Design a protein with these regions (language model features):
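Short S/T/G/P-rich N-terminal loop/turn motif that feeds into the first structured element of a domain
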Residues: 2-64, 71-82, 94-133
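A short, acidic, amphipathic alpha-helical segment used as a generic capping/interface helix at domain edges
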Residues: 84-91
Length: 133
């Protein structure tokens, strides 16, 4: 059994969470692409400070949400840079319309500049805790 480690309550955190809300154009095409292409491609990037990359889809397949978590703002920028240089950057826009972007955490100015082009909303870290295994 793994020992669970809990950070101090209300400790400063540099962790970033990026949430993309999307309207899916074709559910079956999107499901295949997100699982067999996008997730595999991003996994293969071996970005050591990317914590997670997870797609979620509504029951009717009409909406999807991508949630990505990172150690800090700099590692989020590595992911965004890799995304921009990848073939999946164009592919995703053939499959979904991005309807909203939410950036949670203490984003640095370069991240704010990059994500503002997508109309991102920014919320700085305020309070709480996290657990790790």
């Amino acid at each position: 059994k793994r020992k669970q480690v809990m950070a101090e309550l209300n400790a400063h955190s540099n962790r970033m969470v990026l949430v993309f809300n999307c309207k899916v154009k074709n559910a079956s095409d999107f499901k295949a692409w997100s699982k067999d292409r996008a997730a595999k491609y991003v996994y293969g990037c071996k970005e050591e400070n990317t914590i997670s990359y997870e797609w979620h889809i509504s029951d009717d397949g009409s909406e999807a949400t991508l949630i990505e978590t990172f150690v800090d703002s700099d590692s989020m920028m590595v992911r965004l840079g890799n995304h921009g240089a990848s073939p999946i950057a164009a592919e995703v826009l053939e499959l979904v319309d991005i309807t909203g972007v939410l950036c949670l955490g203490n984003a640095k100015q370069d991240a704010i500049d990059a994500l503002s082009a997508w109309g991102a909303i920014f919320h700085a870290h305020h309070a709480g805790f996290h657990k790790s295994n």
